[in-house]
Design a protein with these regions (language model features):
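N-terminal cap/lid segment of alpha/beta-hydrolase-fold proteins
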Residues: 2-39, 43
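A fold-wide structural signal in alpha/beta-hydrolase
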Residues: 26, 43-46, 94-101
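Short beta-strand element of the alpha/beta-hydrolase
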Residues: 40-49, 144
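Alpha/beta-hydrolase active-site loop signature
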Residues: 51, 105-109, 175-176
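A catalytic-pocket lid/entrance helix-loop region that shapes and gates access to the active site
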Residues: 58, 64-69, 121, 146, ...
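Conserved alpha/beta-hydrolase
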Residues: 74, 90-110
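Alpha/beta-hydrolase active-site loop
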Residues: 84-86, 95, 117-137
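Alpha/beta-hydrolase fold nucleophile elbow
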Residues: 137-150
């Protein structure tokens, strides 16, 4: 059994390993960072395979060092304890009254199952998470997506399902056409 807990830390209410039941019965796990005061807030949701609990500094130390060296403003104003690969820093968004939700995709991190990147099942799971986030008592029903690369590509795919509560997407470096964007730039096979 995976333990869930809630705590107030660094000016946020943090809910760890919250279960989200999928339409096929599998339970995915999410970490939720939200304002301390009760209320209904817009949600920034990410869904992906890179372990929601793995800090940027530990998982990708050379990338972290390069980022803070070249872009010190990214780390400024944050303890950086909750920085995670290619997603928003909740310490920068929660003070402006957003809820940040990070979901480990099926078979990754604390979520059971088998990894099947960019599959119809993964896209449906992502849509289920959006619908879940839009109906929570801390949500105002507006769910936005944000993320780089994998987290951007899966945004294009889930948007095709038109989840009811999806209201915004911020795609960074997310290919929407594998042929043109990834494998055949200008029609020529990229190696």
């Amino acid at each position: 059994m995976i333990a869930t807990n809630s705590e107030i830390q660094d000016g946020m209410r943090i809910d760890w390993n919250i279960p989200i039941k999928m339409d096929d019965g599998l339970v995915l796990r999410a970490d939720i960072f939200r304002p301390i005061d009760s209320g209904r807030y817009p949600v920034i949701l990410t869904y992906g395979p890179y372990a929601k609990g793995l800090s940027f500094q530990k998982g990708y130390p050379s990338a972290w060092e390069r980022m803070v060296e070249e872009h010190p403003d990214v780390a400024a104003g944050s303890t950086n304890k909750y920085q995670n690969w290619e997603v928003v820093d909740p310490e920068k968004w929660v003070p402006d009254d957003y809820v940040c939700v990070r979901v480990d995709s099926r078979g990754c991190g604390y979520s059971p199952g088998f990894v099947d990147p960019f599959s119809p099942r993964e896209t449906l799971d992502f849509a289920n998470c959006i619908e879940w986030a839009g109906t929570q008592d801390w949500s105002n029903g507006k769910v936005g997506l944000n993320g780089v690369s994998y987290y951007g590509i899966n945004q294009w795919q889930v948007a095709s399902l038109q989840p009811k509560y999806l209201t915004a997407m911020c795609v960074w470096e997310g290919a929407s056409d594998w042929y043109r964007d990834m494998t055949h730039h200008g029609g020529i096979l990229s190696t």
